[in-house]
Amino acid sequence: MKVAVIYFGGQYNHLIVKDLKYLGLEAVAITPDKSVEELKEFDSVVFGGGPYSVINELDKMGFAPDYVKSLNVPKLGICLGHQLIAKVLGGEVRKANKPEYGLTTVNIVDEDTILRGLKPSIKAWESHNDEVVRPPSGFRILASSENAKVQAMVNNDNSIFGVQFHPEVKHTEKGIEVFKNFIKICRK
């Protein structure tokens, strides 16, 4: 399976590629200046984190909004990628009332997909100023924290996922399980 990891300049994006390669996938870091057509060779897309805000810097994310809307493959958004998916598909993203940095308790409310085996909660690495406050129509919330209601979400057909936390960072408990679950979903 070939996975495009969309690189927005985030400090942890290389860890996503490393984890996916460790799990036996062909993972390639891609900058968002590639056309949608150039990404059609990939079986899935992971949108990494980065320094931008989807609130007022969507224009700095190249073709990434088009990837969200146009690529008909499973998608996983992490941190900024989670916010990007929400914003592009009609959800709401705002400046966080209380930004989260470091380890945070993430409460799993629905573990039937990407969070399988993680209930009731995990300690997860966070690094964000913005947050999804309302998922797009057709999405449900999978996890929350004390400060962020939408820590994880999925669309109704279980093909588009977002997590606010960083499963690729070693401090996140069972972070690799998030990637394993995503791979299982992609292979269905």
UniProtKB/Swiss-Prot annotation:
UniProt-listed InterPro entries: Class_I_gatase-like, GATASE, GMP_synth_GATase, GMP_synthase_A
Keywords (alphabetical) are: ATP-binding, Glutamine amidotransferase, GMP biosynthesis, Ligase, Nucleotide-binding, Purine biosynthesis
Which leading EC class covers this enzyme?
ligase
Pathways per UniProt: Purine metabolism; GMP biosynthesis; GMP from XMP (L-Gln route): step 1/1
GO MF terms on file? Answer: ATP binding; GMP synthase activity
Out of the domains of life, which is the source? Archaea
Check the record and name the Pfam families matching this protein: GATase
* Active-site annotation: C79 (nucleophile), H166, E168
Q: Which reaction does it catalyse?
A: XMP + L-glutamine + ATP + H2O = GMP + L-glutamate + AMP + diphosphate + 2 H(+)
Gene Ontology cellular component list? cytosol
Family matches, as Gene3D superfamilies: 3.40.50.880
**Domain Glutamine amidotransferase type-1, which positions?**
2-188
EC annotation? Answer: 6.3.5.2
Q: How does it assemble?
A: Heterodimer composed of a glutamine amidotransferase subunit (A) and a GMP-binding subunit (B).
Per the entry, what this protein does is: Catalyzes the synthesis of GMP from XMP.
Matching entries from HAMAP family are given as:
GMP_synthase_A
Task: Output this protein's name.
Answer: GMP synthase [glutamine-hydrolyzing] subunit A
- List the source organism: Sulfolobus acidocaldarius (strain ATCC 33909 / DSM 639 / JCM 8929 / NBRC 15157 / NCIMB 11770)
